């Protein structure tokens, strides 16, 4: 591999490192009991990599959550709620009450890696 190929590979690895850098812990709104407006914040532990807001009737839950477990069955089971609307996100204090209006979930780091890896392979194979 020539110098140019090494530079391209180094640049791509640097981009991956930026995507995967964990930095400081995620900060979420987190209240021990359902409430309509949670103002308490917490720094999530490393295994809880997203913030959750879930609404079941008039009860609104705010927690740190494992993004991998952000599915209806896991959320409803953990909160003991049969019907709810939920939202998981990966930015500081993103689980505020208005977040439920946006709906859906954000991309996980694994998904980003799965999208980036084919580009790395293609860049590597294109270099003579």
From Swiss-Prot:
<dbReference type="InterPro" id="IPR016054">
    <property type="entry name" value="LY6_UPA_recep-like"/>
</dbReference>
<comment type="subunit">
    <text>Interacts with T-cell surface antigen CD2.</text>
</comment>
<dbReference type="GO" id="GO:0005886">
    <property type="term" value="C:plasma membrane"/>
</dbReference>
<keyword id="KW-0449">Lipoprotein</keyword>
<feature type="lipid moiety-binding region" description="GPI-anchor amidated asparagine">
    <location>
        <position position="102"/>
    </location>
</feature>
<feature type="propeptide" description="Removed in mature form">
    <location>
        <begin position="103"/>
        <end position="128"/>
    </location>
</feature>
<comment type="function">
    <text>Potent inhibitor of the complement membrane attack complex (MAC) action, which protects self-cells from damage during complement activation. Acts by binding to the beta-haipins of C8 (C8A and C8B) components of the assembling MAC, forming an intermolecular beta-sheet that prevents incorporation of the multiple copies of C9 required for complete formation of the osmolytic pore.</text>
</comment>
<dbReference type="InterPro" id="IPR045860">
    <property type="entry name" value="Snake_toxin-like_sf"/>
</dbReference>
<feature type="signal peptide">
    <location>
        <begin position="1"/>
        <end position="25"/>
    </location>
</feature>
<keyword id="KW-0732">Signal</keyword>
<dbReference type="InterPro" id="IPR056949">
    <property type="entry name" value="CD59"/>
</dbReference>
<feature type="disulfide bond">
    <location>
        <begin position="31"/>
        <end position="38"/>
    </location>
</feature>
<feature type="disulfide bond">
    <location>
        <begin position="70"/>
        <end position="88"/>
    </location>
</feature>
<feature type="disulfide bond">
    <location>
        <begin position="28"/>
        <end position="51"/>
    </location>
</feature>
<keyword id="KW-0964">Secreted</keyword>
<feature type="disulfide bond">
    <location>
        <begin position="44"/>
        <end position="64"/>
    </location>
</feature>
<feature type="glycosylation site" description="N-linked (GlcNAc...) asparagine">
    <location>
        <position position="43"/>
    </location>
</feature>
<dbReference type="GO" id="GO:0001848">
    <property type="term" value="F:complement binding"/>
</dbReference>
<keyword id="KW-0336">GPI-anchor</keyword>
<feature type="disulfide bond">
    <location>
        <begin position="89"/>
        <end position="94"/>
    </location>
</feature>
<keyword id="KW-0325">Glycoprotein</keyword>
<keyword id="KW-1015">Disulfide bond</keyword>
<keyword id="KW-0472">Membrane</keyword>
<protein>
    <recommendedName>
        <fullName>CD59 glycoprotein</fullName>
    </recommendedName>
</protein>
<dbReference type="Pfam" id="PF25152">
    <property type="entry name" value="CD59"/>
</dbReference>
<keyword id="KW-1003">Cell membrane</keyword>
<dbReference type="InterPro" id="IPR018363">
    <property type="entry name" value="CD59_antigen_CS"/>
</dbReference>
<feature type="domain" description="UPAR/Ly6">
    <location>
        <begin position="26"/>
        <end position="108"/>
    </location>
</feature>
<dbReference type="GO" id="GO:0098552">
    <property type="term" value="C:side of membrane"/>
</dbReference>
<dbReference type="GO" id="GO:0001971">
    <property type="term" value="P:negative regulation of activation of membrane attack complex"/>
</dbReference>
């Amino acid at each position: 591999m020539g110098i140019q190929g090494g530079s391209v590979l180094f640049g791509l690895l640097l981009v991956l490192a930026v995507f995967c850098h964990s930095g400081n812990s995620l900060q979420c709104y987190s209240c021990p009991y359902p409430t309509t407006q949670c103002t308490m914040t917490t720094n999530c532990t490393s295994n809880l990599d997203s913030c959750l807001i879930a609404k079941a009737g008039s009860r609104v839950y705010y927690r740190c959550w494992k993004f991998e477990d952000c599915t209806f069955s896991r959320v409803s089971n953990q909160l003991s709620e049969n019907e709810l609307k939920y939202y998981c996100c990966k930015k500081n204090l993103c689980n505020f009450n208005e977040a439920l209006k946006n709906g859906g979930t954000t991309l996980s780091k694994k998904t980003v890696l799965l999208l980036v890896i084919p580009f790395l392979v293609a860049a590597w194979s294109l270099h003579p």
